Curated annotation (Swiss-Prot):
Assembly, per entry: Component of the PNUTS-PP1 phosphatase complex.
UniProt GO MF annotations: chromatin DNA binding
Protein name: TOX high mobility group box family member 4-A
Motif Nuclear localization signal mapped to chain: 212-217
GO biological process, one term: positive regulation of transcription elongation by RNA polymerase II
Region Disordered, annotated ranges: 160-187, 199-224, 522-547
Major subcellular location class: nucleus
Localization, UniProt: Nucleus; Chromosome
Keywords of the record: Chromosome, DNA-binding, Nucleus, Phosphoprotein
Biased composition (Basic residues): 207-217
Cross-referenced Pfam families: HMG_box
PROSITE patterns: HMG_BOX_2 (PS50118)
Length: 597
């Protein structure tokens, strides 16, 4: 192993039986040149406690003779040697970021003041016999600061006489050029690359504080009254500004303050009385404003026909639930001669949007929020304005079990609707009434089918309001069957009505009868409700021209897949559905029950 006086330094490893290294391999270390280092002398009082011999004494029994330098070399240059085992320096090497090479001698950058007259550098020779394979696997030069070494080992190598305190890794760079500066720079760049991402992660972990948004004041809220001094300031500011146009606000404030101090008590009382009167007015206005805030209900409706909702709600009787039905119908080709819809029509070809805002203070605990159910374009709301306008107390907002049953059945039927619009609403109801055949046994049986085929224009259902409960259904068959069939309803509760749409006659000749329900609401109800199913099969040559199924409309139907080619326009579909629904609601509100005669 030759170091001094040579341009190239070679380090031979003689460790026995290492799995990676052999005794013949040599490692080339970079040359530090032939420069000589001059260390300026530092005059300090000698202290026997600062001797290195005490530290060396602790490690005499652990040292390796092979690692000790030549005596002549030590005598000539005054080098103090400190032999330390690898077990003590392993932790230091790892924590300072450097890795030991094979047989590397670690030279301290900073000198240590000792009681000797010369200022010798301290060299640490690491014995290679106890090296572990993990450290031998690396061959990277490492420069260790003396202050870091002493702090990691817990050894006071120089006591309090260490020249430089522990600094951050970036402060170890010397401003003056030195032979070891290039190695140190490389180590510091590696250190920066390792520590830079950690600092970024720490900065990103901090969540920025979101500024609190100030609540906007209501412009309708009454303003607080001014104090007596503010009133005086407002009156005198204009006069002072007129005399001194260039006066600043601070100067004007000082002048007004001096004038207020010199003002008499009686004049101050005038301003104070004004303030008291303004405060009373403010309290009254504030109480009125809060009362309006509690009782105000803002209802904004974006619709094609805004006054349609109150007009429809005014027609429904008081006991029935307030239900607004808006149907979304796609546009189809309509006849130019179609009648214009009345002002009571709610639905339009475009879907309406309803926005209802109800303050929580008005509603009771059970109705803290307005219930809005939407399914297939049907919106059901109970706004508070309608209930209060009818004179109903808020305690009656809870619907009766009958109203809940009606609303629930209507919503269930709407949810079970196919995407295609079915105009007759009576076909969307559940629980069809059971029909019993009262004719003789030789007559064919009647079967109810739920899915209606294309409907014929000659078959009608006439429904009129009635006060007594009896309900009779008469079926007049075609001329092939001379005897009429009388079928009466067995179901006593008319919660949901389903009109049969087709009949199958298994007897010869087989024939299917199709019924088109058309509801005609009469103004004067007769004493009983008669529903007649008139099924006639005229000759094909005499079949009249088809018409719109809505009552009172004589226009021919328009081909549209959304209403089975039965209506002439969107308005007829809406009016037909509305009339049928209103007739059903009025029947339910009167508590009519079907009985069998």
């Amino acid at each position: 192993m030759e170091f001094p006086g040579s341009s190239d330094n070679y380090l031979t490893i003689t460790g026995p039986g290492h799995p990676f290294l052999t005794g013949t391999e040599t490692f080339h270390t970079p040359s530090l040149g032939d420069e000589e280092f001059e260390i300026p002398p530092i005059s300090l009082d000698s202290d026997p406690s600062l001797a290195v011999s005490d530290v060396v004494g602790h490690f005499d029994d652990l040292s390796d003779p092979s690692g000790v330098q030549d005596e002549g070399f030590a005598t000539q240059y005054g080098v103090q040697t400190l032999d330390m085992p690898v077990e003590m320096t392993h932790e230091v090497m790892d924590q300072t970021g450097g890795l030991l090479g094979a047989g590397l001698a670690l030279d301290l950058d900073h000198p240590i003041v000792t009681p000797y007259s010369a200022n010798p550098p301290v060299t640490i020779d690491v014995s290679m016999t106890d090296m572990s394979s993990g450290i031998l696997g690396h061959s990277q030069l490492t420069t260790i600061d003396q202050s870091e070494l002493s702090s990691q080992l817990g050894l006071s190598l120089g006591g309090g006489a260490i020249l430089h305190p522990v600094q951050s890794p970036e402060d170890h760079l010397s401003p003056t050029p030195s032979p070891t500066s290039s190695l140190h720079d490389e180590d510091m760049e590696d250190f920066r690359r390792i520590t830079a991402p950690k600092s970024i992660i720490v900065e990103q972990a901090k969540k920025p504080k979101t500024p609190k948004k100030k609540k906007k004041k209501d412009p309708n809220e009454p303003q607080k009254p001014l104090s007596a001094y503010a009133l005086f300031f407002r009156d005198t500011q204009a006069a002072i500004k007129g005399q001194n146009p260039n006066a600043t606000f601070g100067e004007v404030s000082k002048i007004v303050a001096s004038m207020w101090d010199s003002l008499g008590e009686e004049q101050k009382q005038v301003y104070k009385r004004k303030t008291e009167a303004a405060k009373k007015e403010y309290l009254k206005a504030l109480a009125l404003y809060k009362a309006n805030q509690l009782s105000q209900v803002a209802v904004d409706t974006v619709d094609l026909d805004p006054p349609a909702v109150p007009a429809l709600l005014s027609e429904s009787p008081v006991p029935s639930p307030s239900i607004v039905t808006a149907t979304s119908i796609p546009e189809c080709a309509s006849s130019p001669s179609a009648p214009s819809p009345p002002s009571q029509t709610v639905a339009a070809p475009q879907q309406s949007i309803a926005k209802i805002i109800i303050s929580k203070q008005i509603l009771p605990a059970g109705l803290s929020s307005t219930s809005i159910a939407m399914s297939q374009g049907v919106v059901t709301v109970i706004p508070a304005t309608v209930v209060t306008s009818r004179g109903l107390p808020l305690s009656q907002l809870q619907p009766s079990p009958q109203a809940q049953r009606i609303t629930r059945s209507v919503l269930q039927a709407a949810m079970q609707m196919p995407p295609r619009l079915q105009p007759p609403p009576l076909q969307q109801m559940q629980q069809p009434p059971r029909l019993q055949q009262m004719a003789p046994a030789q007559q064919p049986s009647i079967t109810i089918l739920q899915s209606p085929p294309p409907l014929q224009p000659m078959q009608k259902v006439r429904l009129s309001l009635q006060q007594p409960p009896p309900l009779q259904i008469k079926i007049i068959p075609p001329p092939l069957q001379p005897q009429p069939q009388v079928v009466q309803v067995q179901n006593q509760s008319l919660s949901v009505i389903n009109v049969p749409t087709s009949f199958e006659a298994p007897a010869s000749p087989p024939e299917q009868l199709e019924v088109l329900p058309e509801v005609v609401q009469e103004e004067s109800p007769p004493p009983q409700m008669d529903v007649e199913l008139v099924s006639s099969s005229p000759p094909p040559s005499l079949s009249p021209q088809p018409q719109c199924v809505r009552s009172g409309c004589e226009n021919p139907p328009v081909e549209c897949k959304d209403w089975d080619n039965e209506y002439c326009s969107n308005e007829c579909v809406v009016r037909h559905c509305r009339d049928t629904f209103m007739a059903w609601v009025s029947t339910r509100s009167q508590g009519t029950l079907a009985s069998v005669k």
